[in-house]
């Protein structure tokens, strides 16, 4: 692929993201995870903001927020413009999966935001988090027309 990056570049970007997210946050004995799913524009971000106001010790994981950390983001953006997300998707998927895995191992409270395109990913996440001792809430937000 034209926009390949090194593992070292990935690790550097991952460390930056993880440090930003965990700054001033602490693990919990009884952690909670909120999984938010819905169409773009359904209001997931509003619920996320409300949850963060309610609990300041919570980390929000939203894959779209990590696009700009792609080591070649600006090159991809310059070449593909509005089509650039499909070229950054593998990177943000890898970042997101690792963050969920590592931060849940350490028992941080989490908000995991996504579109829930399939039932498989959120169900797998719920099971994994439950096995790690989490209380899990699945919230599906829908737009009514």
Predicted regions and their residues:
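Conserved glycine(s) of the Walker
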Residues: 43
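Hydrophobic positions on the alpha1 helix immediately C-terminal to the Walker A/P-loop
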Residues: 47
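N-terminal pre-Walker A segment at the start of P-loop NTPase domains
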Residues: 1-25
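Conserved nucleotide-sensing/catalytic segment adjacent to the nucleotide-binding pocket
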Residues: 58-128
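Phosphate-binding P-loop
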Residues: 24-31, 103-104
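Short hydrophobic/aromatic beta-strand immediately N-terminal to the Walker A/P-loop
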Residues: 34-35
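The conserved Walker
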Residues: 39-40
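Conserved phosphate-donor/acceptor-positioning beta-strand/loop module used by diverse small-molecule
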Residues: 130-145
């Amino acid at each position: 692929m034209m926009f390949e990056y090194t593992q070292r570049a990935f690790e550097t970007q991952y460390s930056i993201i993880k440090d930003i997210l965990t700054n001033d946050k602490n693990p919990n004995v009884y952690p909670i995870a909120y999984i938010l799913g819905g169409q773009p524009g359904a209001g997931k971000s509003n619920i996320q903001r409300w949850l963060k106001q309610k609990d300041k010790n919570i980390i929000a994981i939203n894959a779209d927020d990590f696009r700009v950390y792609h080591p070649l983001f600006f090159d991809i953006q310059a070449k593909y413009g509005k089509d650039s997300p499909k070229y950054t998707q593998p990177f943000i998927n890898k970042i997101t999966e690792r963050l969920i895995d590592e931060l849940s191992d350490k028992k941080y409270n989490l908000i995991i935001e996504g579109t829930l395109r399939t039932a498989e990913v959120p169900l797998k996440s719920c099971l994994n988090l439950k096995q790690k001792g989490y209380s899990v809430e699945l919230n599906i937000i829908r737009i009514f027309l």
